[in-house]
């Protein structure tokens, strides 16, 4: 079994390769569209526009990769030197230099970074610009010459050897066997390394010669994962069955393949279904001689079809659904073959199987069974920022962060939740949540954070438990009586409810109905000015409300926004209070068309009293009728009555 250290090193290497490709995927897609549309075998052949294909694949795409690789290794100066070096390897050969760009781009960045480190503090004042500019030019020139004479020819020979190996696999009908290695590697979060580090360079080279490539769909085929998720929908139990439907939509239409990984990790025998489906998909592609014109990212059915030329549509569609059918059949047989002991009383299959899988994996490493543990204990009352991180920082972590953010917003905790790639983790974050296979890497980038490992980014139970712990710690620290009445049972624990008197009294002058505003800035300023008029804040607090809105939208959902000042502006609060501003026509609080606030509640609170202030308002969220009444009534007495009931709850 692969060791933890080895897996982390492989993941880091793969992540580095994919980091060179992923930021430029839009350029690959643009080239793919041009190829699919305008080449002689395209949908709308056009000789003039087809002339874009050659220069883009020869110069633009490798230069972008080299620039990005240089930036990863040596910052902005490294990016420039990386691009110069890449030009050497491009001109030194007569084939597309994607693999060469992945080598020489970081090499150029590393060279200038090493030079800068060597002369740091040794350049006389006034000569910095001269040294910086000429050093980049000279080092770039030398690296380009080396790339031209040495690295370019070497990569050409290497590419030829790889092409010969690929041709052998194709002619010997052995290409489907690659799924034996690809599918398990995907589950270990090596999918980006495989797709963008191996298959994309091979695929681009093949596509430049034949107009399409099978390599773009070996890893990106959504069929194997689709079949496994469908099997869970039919034969699964408990949470696994309940969540499989939503996961299927996200996987197949959204293209986020990581969503199905936990379903295999909880039942490792299903890797056989993924392998069988993958082999079927590759075999079908070889039979139809089908492929894509460019990488499909994300691996959505829509992205795949858009990157398919008209001659391969049938083959690509058949490969996807054939792979899904085979993986579904194998997964169904494996799931039905489970013993009755495994099935009886199993009302929460996902949680139970995940626990078993954790124990098995920990036992193989000679460790105790992993749980949602932390690498470094911190005071939960001091947690202000949580980052949900994954390999690419786009798909699975974005969903997890969205789910956790909603729960935290629902209970009014002053904690920010974001998502990002592991390699981009900042050092100052309080808490990091990752898949357990990625936690070791996350610890390297954020060693001072508290790390929580999970097996499924949609693990609602774990998020509920975390919110409960944060609530308990912050209530105890601030002696708060009532935060927002939680809409999640795990966070609604009577042990933490302590009755205390309200910190403000809502009066008619606090309520303003039937307002209109052109934008959220106008609505926020109106609320801020009313806070000033009522003697709650100093005028400077209004500017702080705009500063707070720039950080993250104060729109909570359910047609409610709660603009308030920054933490630094609390000294401009005279006393705790609120103003309720009703906008029946709504005010857009973000570019999201759904974030329209009809209640804009300006808040001013001293210390941590704002949590109690929000409580009085958001207790009404449990009653949809109350929300409708608050956003449409023309009688101030209705508002006072509803909120008085909420405050007493």
UniProtKB/Swiss-Prot annotation:
Signal peptide: none
Domain PTS EIIC type-2: 13-342
Residues that span the membrane, as ranges: 25-46, 51-71, 135-156, 166-186, 274-293, 314-335
Membrane topology designation: Multi-pass membrane protein
Main location: membrane
Any single Gene Ontology cellular-component annotation: plasma membrane
Upregulation: Induced by mannitol. Repressed by MltR.
Coiled coil: none
Stabilizes the transition state in the phosphoryl transfer from HPr to EIIA (site feature) positions: 548
Catalytic activity: D-mannitol(out) + N(pros)-phospho-L-histidyl-[protein] = D-mannitol 1-phosphate(in) + L-histidyl-[protein]
Post-translational modification note: An intramolecular phosphotransfer takes places between His-564 and Cys-390.
Modified residues (Phosphohistidine): 564
Keyword list, A-Z: Cell inner membrane, Cell membrane, Kinase, Membrane, Phosphoprotein, Phosphotransferase system, Sugar transport, Transferase, Transmembrane, Transmembrane helix, Transport
Pfam families recorded: PTS_EIIA_2, PTS_EIIC, PTS_IIB
Record PTM Phosphocysteine, positions in chain: 390
Residue ranges constituting the PTS EIIA type-2 domain according to the UniProt record: 504-646
Gene Ontology MF annotations: kinase activity; protein-N(PI)-phosphohistidine-mannitol phosphotransferase system transmembrane transporter activity; protein-phosphocysteine-sugar phosphotransferase activity
Presence of the UniProt keyword Ubl conjugation in the record: no
Active-site positions on this chain: 390, 564
Family annotation (PANTHER family): MANNITOL PERMEASE IIC COMPONENT, PTS SYSTEM MANNITOL-SPECIFIC EIICBA COMPONENT
Biological role stated in the UniProt entry: The phosphoenolpyruvate-dependent sugar phosphotransferase system (sugar PTS), a major carbohydrate active transport system, catalyzes the phosphorylation of incoming sugar substrates concomitantly with their translocation across the cell membrane. This system is involved in D-mannitol transport.
Protein's UniProt name: PTS system mannitol-specific EIICBA component
